[in-house]
Design a protein with these regions (language model features):
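Ser/Thr/Pro-rich low-complexity tandem-repeat tracts
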Residues: 3-18
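Charged, low-complexity surface segments at secondary-structure and domain boundaries
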Residues: 1-4, 119-123, 232
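Extended hydrophobic/aromatic segments used for targeting, binding, or gating
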Residues: 217-242
Length: 258
């Protein structure tokens, strides 16, 4: 049977969401309506079950305002990791970093179907995410506070869904068949264009080659410049030799003063 993430319903109330939250909810609906076949066996949609913490992150640090200007650098990841955003709803969302550095914490629900080896425990998840520890750890060491970091940068993921095979192996979007990629990437491209319209980034930096390629394809007509930096995944041998100094060199090569 094809796997399908959950589709959220809009809460009742007098006001409708706007800005980044509206884009996020629309993406959750579009991506949540798609089906994925074997070897994908489980699909998690943290924009639905971790909506509270995800939207807290968007509104606190993303929406342009007095403390979060337009024209920042947008760091774009690929998709949620099983022990990061899948648990917390925040990109590169290592539990300790999200809770203790970003100050974001909220009740997290559960996807309709969970792999028994990959349960969603929200902020009670005992495992850390190396990529998130590296990215947010760099932000903390370099900038000191979230406010100082988010004056310069914002972080999102291109795709909101987590894909797992029957044995619990993580499956990244680039491994999906073309027939499944096409509608998914169309939804993600649209959301990225809409996010860029809200944020007006001076530069989009793909965290890894996949994200940079998708950003170039989605944002090319708008003229937003796109670059890339090394992904912090421990599966990347080069990242294990000292990710932070490597990406600082890459960012400086792009003309950024750190």
């Amino acid at each position: 049977m094809p796997s399908k993430p959950s589709i959220p319903s809009e809460p009742s109330g007098p006001s409708k969401p706007s800005g980044l939250v509206a884009v996020s909810r629309a993406l959750a609906r579009r991506a949540g309506g798609l089906r994925f076949g074997p070897p994908t066996a489980f699909v998690y949609n943290p924009l639905v079950y971790a909506r509270a913490s995800h939207e807290a992150y968007l509104t606190r640090y993303g929406e342009p305002g007095a403390g979060t200007p337009r024209g920042r650098v947008l760091l774009l990841g690929m998709n949620p990791g099983p022990f990061g955003m899948a648990q917390t709803g925040v990109p590169f969302g290592d539990v300790a970093m999200v809770r203790d550095f970003l100050g974001v914490s909220a009740p997290v629900g559960r996807p309709p179907r969970e792999h028994p080896a990959r349960p969603v425990r929200g902020f009670e998840c005992p495992r850390g995410e190396v990529s998130g520890t590296r990215l947010w750890g760099w932000a903390r060491e370099r900038f000191g506070t979230p406010q100082a970091f988010f004056q310069r940068f914002f972080v999102i993921n291109y795709c909101p869904l987590v894909f797992m095979e029957a044995r619990g192996q993580n499956r990244t979007p680039d491994k999906l068949p073309a027939t499944e990629q096409a509608p998914l990437f169309a939804a993600c491209d649209r959301a990225l264009v809409e996010m860029a319209a809200v944020l007006a980034p001076a530069l989009v930096v793909g965290v890894g080659a996949f994200a940079a390629t998708r950003a170039e394809l989605a944002l090319g007509p708008s003229g937003v410049p796109v670059a890339s930096i090394l992904h912090p995944s421990p599966a990347n041998p080069r990242a294990n030799t000292g990710w932070a100094p490597i990406i600082e060199g890459q960012l400086r090569a792009l003309g950024m003063a750190l």
